[in-house]
Amino acid sequence: KAADVVVIGTPIYNFSVPAALKAWIDQVARARETFQYTENGPVGLLKDKKAIIAVASGGTQAGSEIDFATTYLKHFLGFLGITDVTVIAADQLMVNPDKRADAISLAEQLAA
């Protein structure tokens, strides 16, 4: 809760996130800590924060209909109240190795 920016770096494994990241998500999603239930449904408590999701994949294109990892992480962060999310995708590296340089460039821009 003290962080201003949450950075998640993950591969896309079989269209989704690795088990270790899912375990972290299960530890972070805590009622009355990171979200709360209301009469109108759950409300995220982590407002005014930013997130960066850095994903890497061999064949899955980030943001495509078969990329459940990025969609899931954006939904999870939104559930917590974090809606300012930037995605850095080093995707389809087995298809186009040049995409790695593009992802590094974007990460460097964000770090500046």
Indicate where each model-derived feature is located.
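Glycine-rich phosphate/pyrophosphate-binding loop and the adjoining helix
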Residues: 63-112
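Helix-loop-strand module that forms the ligand-binding subsite of alpha/beta enzymes
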Residues: 1-71
